[in-house]
Amino acid sequence: MSHSANFVNVQSPPSYIQLAQQQQQQQQQQLQQQQQTQNPTSPTSFLAQQQYSGNIPTTASNQQPYQHIPQPYQPNISSILQPLPIRYIYVNQLPLAQQQQQLQQNQLQQQPPNVIYQQQPLIVQQQQQPNTVQQQQQQPPQTIQQQPNMAQPQPQQTQQFTMEQTFQNILNKIKDKFDKFTTNHVGQDNITFNNAQLPIAKECNTILLKLQNNRNIHTSSLPFTLTPEVYKPPEFFTKVDIIQYHLSGLASILVLMKLSQVDPSFAKQINLMTVKSKFMIEMLAKIFQQQLDNRNNNNNNNTMSMSITNSTVLSSQKNNNPIIIYFNQQFENIKQLKDYFETSDISSNGLVFFTQTLFSMLTGRGYFWYIGEEVTKQLKYKIFETIYDNLFRTVMKCTSETKYKYNLGCFCYSYFKIIQSDHQVTSARFVTQKPQIKDDLYKYLLHYLSLSNDQLSRALSDVPISDSTIWLIYAKTCCLLNQEEKAQIWIQYFINEATDRVTAAAMIQLDEDIAHYHSKSWYVDIMKSIEEEKKKRIEEDDRLNKQRKQQQQQQQSNSSSPHIVGGHVQDQYSEIKTNLLLEGLVLKNMNHDASLISSNVLLNLHPLPQSKEVQIAQQRLNERLELYMLKNSKEIPGDGNCQMHALSDQLYGDLSHSQEVRKTIVDWLRKNKDFQLPNGATICQFVNTNNWDDYCNDMSKNGNWGDHLTLLAAAEHFGSKISIISSVESQSNFFIEIIPSKILNDKVLLLSHYAEFHYGSLCPLR
């Protein structure tokens, strides 16, 4: 549903435009009077002598000043950063035709325009020097460094003109860059695009992960967060890369068009650009559909696993392809930007997309459309302030939309870090040396930090999100605001829920926002537990190297595990796939990306092996392990005890406890025959024999395969989550998770399952 761009719940009185014109005439008269009393050889303008405060002027008439919706306290940036007067350039703008008419009138009067867009809030640019005590109280104190020098004033008219030219120059550069990109990667009649390759299955699955987690396809960053590293464009552009760059460039051009006094005829060129984008999206959708049809018709060759055909982006319906859905959403947002340029009407989502594009252009180092080096620091500050205004208004307007709270919380923290860096206010200084920071600067930093903390707290309470980046940002805001109890909870949560606790703890240890808590007893205890894990990891690496040497010398057989007792494994496998739905057994695991399936289905992963599929299955498993940055911890022998070997390695760091693990599991099974699942079934109902004791006796024998029940028993006895990445062909059920009724151990047991007959032990890549 489309909304107007006016996010202020008041009617804008039309007399304000007239008031602005009256003020302009009054200023011209005063300027003439001042020039008569000054030396004619060194005239100074009236605007140059005014002290810009950013507040709404008090008029001498009966007109009511422009009122904003209620906002929390916000220190005025003008006393700190000497902003350029472009605040509120996205709200209540006149239609483009009226803007151009006003610009022509100003040019006829041989005067530079007093405002970029003729809109009500910009009347602050024509305000006179406040004379009343009340007006002086509205002006926040200024820092010593930024006190205006009345003897050498900076003429604001020149600033406005320079700012307009700056945006125009940036637009021209981005347009030239966009044209070159289109020529090199799209080509005439889309020839180059048609010849570009499709992303392979691994790349498509990576894209899908990013889309599911609301990440940028190329930078992998959340909206309104700062990227820690400089982004590097791909060496070879796939069709997906080309479309994303084309859409991002088009959005950047439309944003700059809105910020500059561009000729309306320039908008005609946008139509051709948008048509080209839509054509490429439709072409990609057709190619995906062809790949899907080929797969359904079983026409794929042995290289299928390296093709898009094997990716989860393909579904049974063309319109359900997640990449195409994403690109179509991007295209609709671009259409809104085009309408915004022409009519100033835009929806809440469109406005957020506008500000998100602008934020990326200013902060995305290495981003293809990066303009951060083209704008002055003061202008950048004002743009950031305007982004804040838009996001805040969106939150106030759409109170039920939690995603806007996350956006505002992330932006406020990012802006806090930018101001910190520019003013050399370290986090340690912010927390412990408050008296040494100028009062207005400290209030300004505190405002954005507090607002970030508040918005993220509200959002996490309303709709929790399984994104560790959000958790860490919120934890850091709690640290900087000395909310120690909350900081402790979220730091511990961030570390414990990480796949690799050691790496997560290293991130915490190196973060300056948390450094002042390093001496706290709870923090010391956390890091001690991590040090123990580090030592175990070193020992595991040493044992792994020794074992590899021994295995190379012994040249052990790589034959598969023997058949499980009974002659009906395949029938059992099919039956369990159909019937074993353990509702509620598996809770949503916040330990992995959203794409990792928090499955409520435990499958018996032991059908009869089919040798012709082994090679494809191995390649499929390797791609999945690489995608989630995992590797085999040790080479597990294929002697029928592979599941027990893998569990032994995960629990004790070596394979020497395999028999002990088997005995422990079987003992638990004997004692818990009637263990009830959440759906009311008992585990003894899921064996291939009516005699539970016979099943346990067979499972206790060396060389017999472990199954789904032994995994369940291991999870319950050891109190640990078990995560399994399988080589099964299904792209929706390859990640299986078993969560015990009571978690006693924070360590997650990571297993692989290869070619339907062999288990492996996994560890993170290092």
UniProtKB/Swiss-Prot annotation:
UniProt GO molecular function: cysteine-type deubiquitinase activity
Compositional bias ranges of the Low complexity kind: 550-561
BP terms from Gene Ontology: proteolysis
Enzyme active site: 639, 642, 758
Residues in OTU domain copies: 631-765
Family matches, as Gene3D superfamilies: 3.90.70.80
Family annotation (InterPro entries): OTU_dom, Papain-like_cys_pep_sf, Peptidase_C85-like
EC number: 3.1.2.-
Region named Disordered: 129-159, 537-566
Keywords per UniProt: Hydrolase, Protease, Thiol protease
Name used for this protein in its record: OTU domain-containing protein DDB_G0284757
Source organism of this protein record: Dictyostelium discoideum (Social amoeba)
